Amino acid sequence: MNGKSFLDSSSTKILQDLAVAPIDLTSPGIISKERIERFSLFVEGFTFSYAMERVDDGILSALTGLASERGLLASMKAMQNGEVVNYIDNFPSESRPALHTATRAWVRGISLTGNAEDISLRSKIEVQRLRDFLNKYRDAFTTIVQIGIGGSELGPKALHCALKGCCPSDKKVYFVSNVDPDNAAEVLQEIDCSKTLVVTVSKSGTTLETAVNEELFADHFLKQGLSFRDHFIAVTCEGSPMDDTTRYLEVFHIWDSIGGRFSSTSMVGGVVLGFAYGFDAFIQLLEGAAAMDLVALEPHMSENLPMLSAMLGIWNRNFLRYPTTAVIPYSMGLEYFPAHLQQCGMESNGKSVAQTGELIGFSTSPILWGELGTNSQHSFFQALHQGSDIVPVEFIGFLRNQRGRDIEISGSSSSQKLFANMIAQSIALAKGRENVNPNKNFKGNRPSSLLVSERLTPYTMGALLAFYEHKIVFQGFCWGINSFDQEGVTLGKDLANQVLRIMQGQQGGDNVVIEAEALLGLFDKNKKLKEFGEA
């Protein structure tokens, strides 16, 4: 990563000047067939169209220059080769590599060295152990419940949803994440415990929400006369309190160098996906992700899909100053994907301190959000078209549906109607529509991109997952921040434990005692807090 500040880069100054009068997408003839063909990229079964972004050749050249100045490619190579990228200079930090790409590098025989080679070999061993476990136990259970929170739930849940439409399965899958006991109670009402496998996922083995939910499940199983060890397995770091094969039926491993939000291609996602859809489906997902890892190493930005998309996002965020980005998938299989991206993007790049340890004076991660199309067209798209804030949109679509069932009505199939809506929204946002009635006038110039593949499969889902991982990481490299820690999450955990001690009549800690006691007193006028949650 370049030691110079993002703001001090010469390309930044060029882009600031260009942003004063960016291309007007509403001008007649601007969005031409030639522009649409030139501003597109074909890679790993995806077509990426950025003709509806407010960029031209000059802006793209300056963005390429900025990516070069900020050392994006070198930083990506360093990350994938296992160099330490999770650090803050001159201050205590995690100071370790970020090796999520190593969890899938082995499936394509990607050559690695040092830490990356070690984690790749270990990942291959864990996958082989998973294969053996599935061969032995998969037929013994009809249901799997994954207990975990954050990256131990959001990514695997998004992938499960993506695969269930294309991979036949007779298995039932549930996720329990929230410490709200109603989350666990709802699942327990649905399952036959005697035929259920529970996988508890926690890197540290001490995650509060996960430990509480596991205990709740264990108590329920015990009351039904079922052995904990016969039904519970774990995914955790070696040496954690959960790394205990005398307690669990099996323990699979993950490593500190793999962040939770980037862990879906490790055993964090592998166990539940392998159980639900079979070992081969998980391998295909790994192959797609590994293929996109190689794309992220392409030297030219025009051929490097994650880098190109990352720099378009930098343009929208830092130069056109758009505060949020919407991700709108036109596929039921991606129902939970925006929630995963929200964590991946905002937990990674929601930072205001540079890796140098200095405060930064520019915007970092936009607010990431989204919902399925066409549903979202009938909820918040009004604001996208005519709201006071311009929101760049990233559309994701597929030419064919997953399940193969469709019907033709009025000359077109449902899949064609879905795809037509996505294309129409992109055009409408860019071009707008003039009307003398101001309430019916659409100004346009609202940027978007289109990412399209033929069909959502395990392979394309793996590639899509890795595409967004690398896009987010490239942006962190460009901003000069550490995309791999999450001190804000740690702070909340620490203070919650202090508040709990106060609720239990113990010393809570100087950080929160006055505020917590006042707030707890406000909510405790009629009922003792220790009775909360009881019938």
Curated annotation (Swiss-Prot):
Coiled coil: none annotated. Keywords: Cytoplasm, Gluconeogenesis, Glycolysis, Isomerase. GO terms for cellular component: cytosol. Its main location: cytoplasm. It catalyses: alpha-D-glucose 6-phosphate = beta-D-fructose 6-phosphate. One of its GO terms (biological process) is glycolytic process. The keyword Repressor does not apply. GO terms for molecular function: carbohydrate derivative binding; glucose-6-phosphate isomerase activity; monosaccharide binding. Pathway: Carbohydrate biosynthesis; gluconeogenesis; Carbohydrate degradation; glycolysis; D-glyceraldehyde 3-phosphate and glycerone phosphate from D-glucose: step 2/4. InterPro entries: G6P_Isomerase, G6P_Isomerase_C, Phosphoglucose_isomerase_CS, SIS_dom_sf, SIS_PGI_1, SIS_PGI_2. The keyword Isomerase applies. Catalyzes the reversible isomerization of glucose-6-phosphate to fructose-6-phosphate. This is Glucose-6-phosphate isomerase. It comes from Chlamydia felis (strain Fe/C-56) (Chlamydophila felis).
